[in-house]
Structures are given as C-alpha cells and as structure tokens.
Amino acid sequence: MAIEESPTYAEPGPYEALSRFSSLTREDHRKWWEHTGPVLEKVLKDSGYELQSQYTYLYFVQQHLVPYLGTFPTRGEDEHRWQSNLTPYKVPYELSWNISNKVVRISWDPVCDASGTEADAFNKKAIHDCTRQIAQLSNTIVLDRYRILHQELVISDQEEQELLRRDDLPKSGRGQHNLAVDFQNGGIALKVYFYPYMKFLATGSPVEQLFFAAIEKIGTADIQEPVKMLRCFLSPSFDDGKPSVDQKVFPSLLACDLCDPSKSRIKYYVIDKWVKWERIASLWTIGGRRLEDPSCAKGLALLKELWDLLAIPEGDRGDIWPNLVLGQPPTHLMTTMANYTLSPASRFPEPQVYLTTFGMNDMAIMDALTAFYERAGLTDMAKSYKKNVQSYYPNLDLSQTNWVHEAISFSYRNSKPYLSVYYSPF
C-alpha cells in the first residue's frame, strides 16, 4: 500500500500570517497595511530582529498605527486627505533606519476622520486617543511632558476659531504634532514632536520664545547650562560674546521622549535655509562654543567626510516646504536641519545634523552611503545596503528616482558615528 506524503508548504512570514485574520475592515486601513507591512518586515529582518520581534512590531503597526493614518494617498487626489507636515509629499507616515545600531523607527502624524474638516480643522483630536492607547501598552511610557508641551504649543479652541476667521491662513501646514516610535530591545520608545507655526500665527509670540517658555514649564533645573548655551547661539539678544545665527536659521520643532521625566531628553530643532558646509560646521560646533568638547572635532571630521561623499549642492533654499504633488518628482532641493539634545548628561547641547538629500539621485546617494559605511567600519551594511533598499521599492528604478532618500542624520556618540536614513513612503 502506497503511503501518501503530507503536502509541503512554505511557512508564512510575519506579514502574511498577520494579514490572514486581520481585523482591519476599512479599505484605507487595509491599503496602508498592504503598503507599509511588507517593507517593514524586510527592514526588520535586514536589521537582524528576531522572528518574535518581527511579529511584535508588525502587530503593533497593524493594530495601533495604521488606524491613525487616515485616507490612503492616491495620485491626483491630494486634496482629499490630510496634508501632514511630516514628509515632503505631506504623507503622515515615515520609516527611518538607524544604520549604526540597526534600529528601526516609524514616525507618523495621527489622523482621524475629522482631521482637516470643520470638526477638527487643525487635526488636534487624533493624537490624544493615539497616545493614550499606546501608553496602555507599556508602563515605561509616561505622558507628563506630552501634556505640558501640548498645553504650551498647540492652539486652544479659542485661538483655533480666531485663526479660521483669517483670510491669510494657509491651507497646508496646519498640523501641530507627530509621534515616533523606536523598535528596540523588544519594547517601544515613544517620542512626540510639536510644530509651532499655528501657535505663532495665533499668538504673535516668536517661535523661539514659545519653545524656551515650554522648556521652562517642563523644568530646567538640571539642564540650565546647555539651555543657556543654545539660547545664546540662536538669539542675538542673549549675547555671550560668541557668534549667533542669522535670520536664515530658525526654530522648527520641539520634541521629547515620553518616558520617565528624569530620563526624558528634550530636542530643539532648527532649519537653515542656506545650505553650505561652513554653516553646517557652525551648527555642529554651536558657533564655536562646543570646540572644547573632545568629541566635537572627531565628529566634525566624519561629518565632513559624509558631506563630501553626498556632494549636496550648496545654495539658498528659498522655499523651505515646496508645494509638491504626490507622484511628481521634486524639481528642487531642500534645507539643512539640526536638532540639539538638552540633557543632564552633557553641559553642551548635543547636535544632530540632517543632510537633506530629497531631490537628489537615489543611486548616487546609495553609492555615497556605501562608501561612508566602508570608511566607518560598517562592512556588512556596506555590502548589503543597495540591494536591501532596492528590495523595499521593487517597482522603482532607483537610478532614475530622486525622492526615496529624504535625509541622512548624523551625530557622534560614544566615540562612533550615529547615522540614520529617512525614506519616502512612496
């Protein structure tokens, strides 16, 4: 009697397994999951995450992030979705990859059905529900600083009504916050970011003043020295006898970790409209104030290597946030960004510089990054980077695109470069 062999089948990966009995019933949510899930699975795998962690983080995205992404972007229908501040194409989702530590991060702008409508013209509601939901998943997430910064930097209901009566209110750029989560050590680390422009329009208070007032509300007893140094660098009215920035540099974001306040870092972001190496060096050294920090010169030398390899054209970027249309390649370049970490761990504001590559050829960027990885001793990443990134965009010819690599961030910590790459979701 012949014995029938059991049929063999391939074990499904985490994305496929989680999709089989997905609870996502809305079409937009399913589209978001189908678009983001496979790429996230690949990046997690390429970063060396164990299979259990891949399941954990994909499930987190499916259940707690996708439902807050709103209408799925469709070419030619930009006006039908929330115009997010998060990405150049105003899409509320961004994946980034910490190359040095192989940590995956997702940033998103929580959106609900009311976002952008008369019921919630400035998208103030969704983030509350989203943060509360995520905070219930881990006792390491603490929302104290979120509440303080939201109170200080997000427009009130009265200010909202006053803004809506103005004839000069821009249609885009109304968002005031976004979230980010790091997938690390089997858990999640949550961060919040605040955009100040609407609060500035509503109150007339300079953004710099809004930011430092908010920092004071949080409490600065243990970070007075780095706060004072940063304030002197960013404002000529706080003179310490050393150079301060000009009008091309201005504050753009204030962020913090949503964890135990004693461990939470504050991050102060600036934009420089004039892209030039000497100005990037000034951002890094804080106008020369940080030169006595032993790590400053070492980090600056590596940053210069990265700058030279990327070959970003210098120039004045007049339009800091161009009116891009999804599906149309960018035709010009964007600004430099930097953030400064304010923490009791250092008397200096710790800089992180963002070299914005959006608008540059993606293959050229991958070649430059591969060369830098080799110089930095990241040999495995140097060997696999181009092949991996091409697999994340199977329908694109990266020798012809100029929007996939949005930016490269660089800092120098624990005597080694700390590099992250930010990718376009489309």
Swiss-Prot record:
The stretch of residues making up the signal peptide is: none
Describe the applications of the protein: Notoamides have been shown to exhibit antitumoral activities. Notoamides A-C show moderate cytotoxicity against HeLa and L1210 cells with IC(50) values in the range of 22-52 mg/ml, but the IC(50) value of notoamide D is greater than 100 mg/ml. Moreover, notoamide C induces G2/M-cell cycle arrest at a concentration of 6.3 mg/ml.
Q: Which CDD domains match?
A: PT-DMATS_CymD (cd13929)
One biological process term from GO is: alkaloid metabolic process
Q: Where, in this chain's numbering, is substrate bound?
A: 94, 195
Q: Name one Pfam family in it.
A: Trp_DMAT
* Catalysis performed (reactions): 6-hydroxydeoxybrevianamide E + dimethylallyl diphosphate = notoamide S + diphosphate
What pathway is this protein a component of? Answer: Alkaloid biosynthesis
Q: What is its EC number?
A: 2.5.1.-
Residues that bind dimethylallyl diphosphate, according to the entry? 105, 191, 193, 267, 269, 352, 354, 418, 422
MF terms (GO), sorted A to Z? prenyltransferase activity
Keywords in alphabetical order: Alkaloid metabolism, Prenyltransferase, Transferase
Q: Please explain the role this protein plays, according to its UniProt record.
A: Prenyltransferase; part of the gene cluster that mediates the biosynthesis of notoamide, a fungal indole alkaloid that belongs to a family of natural products containing a characteristic bicyclo[2.2.2]diazaoctane core. The first step of notoamide biosynthesis involves coupling of L-proline and L-tryptophan by the bimodular NRPS notE', to produce cyclo-L-tryptophan-L-proline called brevianamide F.
NCBIfam families in the record = arom_pren_DMATS
Give the family per the record. Answer: Belongs to the tryptophan dimethylallyltransferase family.
- Entry's PANTHER family? INDOLE PRENYLTRANSFERASE TDIB-RELATED (PTHR40627), PRENYLTRANSFERASE ASQH2-RELATED (PTHR40627:SF3)
According to UniProt, the name of this protein is 6-Hydroxy-7-prenyldeoxybrevianamide E synthase notC'
What species is this protein from? Answer: Aspergillus versicolor
**Top-down, what is the taxonomic lineage of the species of origin?**
Eukaryota, Fungi, Dikarya, Ascomycota, Pezizomycotina
